[in-house]
Amino acid sequence: MDTIIEEYLKFIQLEKGLSSNTIGAYRRDLKKYNTFLELQKISHIDFIDRASIQQCLGYLHDNGASAKSLARFISTIRSFHQFALREKYAAKDPTVLIETPKYDRKLPDVLEINEVLALLETPNLAKINGYRDRTMLELLYATGMRVSELIQIELEDVNLIMGFVKVFGKGNKERIVPLGDTVIEYLKTYIETIRPQLLKKTVTNTLFLNMHGKPLSRQAIWKMIKQNAIKANITKSLTPHTLRHSFATHLLENGADLRAVQEMLGHSDISTTQLYTHVSKSQIRKMYNEFHPRA
């Protein structure tokens, strides 16, 4: 099993172009799966059947796994067994009759427009790292891109004359996202004036750099967002995706086309984008309850 798992992980990295974070999640799920099978003395992939998978799911559930975690786990092992069958490592796929549990998708936390503006205005523009941070925050809110996508952007991906940025999303899929005048101005100053000061003697095409001239990490950007949110007196629970959620919700609240928002976010399934319409409706209900005299 260990060999097949490693071959599968190589496959999803090379053929599907998944990020290291996604591959890490797949690896953790498959390690749990393999550990359980070893405890059950199942030593060969063809000895796995529907009953052993259901026992594994029961074991994970009893140890606190949520319906969402189980759904992801099933998706991982289903993909793994399909690969094993296709590549002739196995004679059958035991996941065929396994159902994915349904779970309530949590509505994402969204910042109000005034909260976004407060967050954007927090970095100190007199400092080079402050100007860089303001530019990153502006770009995240202007495009709805993921933090993991932001750190991959290179200079040639940004076209300030035409007003767009190339974003490489999940599976290395490329999409073009338009840029507004405000973020274009910040990017122009950052690229021409701020980035050369950060670059120093380093040679890299990565757009956003730390104070040592190296590409910024996901963790560093997340830390920056949290610190600025505290300074802006934002009490909501933030995640690295909060500005992405806010971007989508604010567009839809102002009448943007759902499919256009789907395209900008890079969602392969429109049902994922539709989640933001529910956020908008919940905001409408909240306003109705607060302001209507007969609510």
From Swiss-Prot:
All residue ranges annotated as the Tyr recombinase domain in the record: 106-289
InterPro entries linked: CB (IPR044068), DNA_brk_join_enz (IPR011010), Integrase-like_cat_sf (IPR013762), Integrase_catalytic (IPR002104), Integrase_recombinase_N (IPR010998), Integrase_SAM-like_N (IPR004107), Recomb_XerD (IPR011932), Tyrosine_recombinase_XerC/XerD (IPR023009)
Active site: 146, 170, 241, 244, 267, 276 (o-(3'-phospho-dna)-tyrosine intermediate)
A GO cellular component annotation in the UniProt record: cytoplasm
Pfam families: Phage_int_SAM_1, Phage_integrase
First-listed, main subcellular location of the protein, grouped into a coarse class: cytoplasm
Location in or out of the cell: Cytoplasm
GO process terms (BP): cell division; chromosome segregation; DNA transposition
Gene Ontology molecular function: any one: tyrosine-based site-specific recombinase activity
The entry's keywords: Cell cycle, Cell division, Chromosome partition, Cytoplasm, DNA integration, DNA recombination, DNA-binding
Domain Core-binding (CB): 1-85
Family, similarity comment: Belongs to the 'phage' integrase family. XerD subfamily.
Oligomeric form and interacting partners: Forms a cyclic heterotetrameric complex composed of two molecules of XerC and two molecules of XerD.
Described purpose of this protein according to its UniProt entry: Site-specific tyrosine recombinase, which acts by catalyzing the cutting and rejoining of the recombining DNA molecules. The XerC-XerD complex is essential to convert dimers of the bacterial chromosome into monomers to permit their segregation at cell division. It also contributes to the segregational stability of plasmids.
Protein name (record): Tyrosine recombinase XerD
